Amino acid sequence: MNRFSRRALDFVAAFAMGVPSPLVMNGADPAKIVLVAGEVKQVDKPGHHDYLGGCRLMAALLRQSEGVEPVLVEKDWPADEAVFEGAEAVVFYTDGGGKQACLSHPGRIARIEDLVKQGAGLTLLHQAVEFSPAFAKQSLAWSGAAYTPLSARGHWDSSHDSFPGHPVSRGVIPWKINDGWLNRLHFVDGMTGITPLVWSSKTGGGAPGGTPDIVAWTYDRPDGGRSFSFSGLDAHAAWELEGMRRLVINGILWSAGLEIPAAGAPCAADKALIDSFLTPRTPPPPKVKKP
């Protein structure tokens, strides 16, 4: 029996006994969620690709749900891989395009493969959704999609005001943003197990854009595990948007096999709290215009 199956049985048992816990049964072991932060460039605009700041904030938000135990890993990969033991889900908020530390060594790939086979949830955020072509097989198997030479990326404005009936969408309110997106991904054959959640392109931000515009999705994997991916979150300021914030927290908890409350998972945060997690940076020197 994999981790997802055990967690599902815990929830069913709690429901049958009338235990009032929306996420996990009171008294059960907490759901361990490992947050892997990509290394943050020291010289860069404050908030840009602040993977560590984002993971620290996500840990604080996840703690608002009873029975959840977030564990933070800094700088790409843990010094001791034992941190993954017993994890209900693993979150990667890192650079992509082959820069992922989890893909840099056969042993690390095997470690993630083992977690996936055991039914652990997997969440990929922002550039972490972009595996290099050499790892397209893993990308499809783990997340249900792959970034290809035909895929696209860029910054543009988009509005998001309607969401499908899925647990990850619970309590998600509309938002508008100029974000850095990756879209035009290649999905598994027949979109089997895929549920699109958010769409974005330079010309729109809704379902009419179809498969090419998908930027957030869930994947019910054939092994019984769950994956959630979202290609936004280029800048730390995006966390100020409650709708986006709840989508991500819901997605992580859902990937861990947890039931999402009807109003969505709690994710209260004001600007002061969000900014308190910013990683100190040295701004890059101003660009000098050529004469």
Predicted segments, located by residue:
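Positively charged n-region of N-terminal signal peptides that target proteins for export
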Residues: 1-7
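Helical hinge/lid and interdomain linker segments adjacent to catalytic or ligand-binding clefts
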Residues: 4, 32-36, 43-131
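Bacterial N-terminal signal peptides
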Residues: 10-22
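Catalytic beta-strand/loop cores that center a nucleophilic Ser/Cys/Thr
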Residues: 63, 145-224
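A glycine-rich, often tryptophan-bearing local segment used as a flexible ligand/cofactor-contacting loop or short
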Residues: 97-174
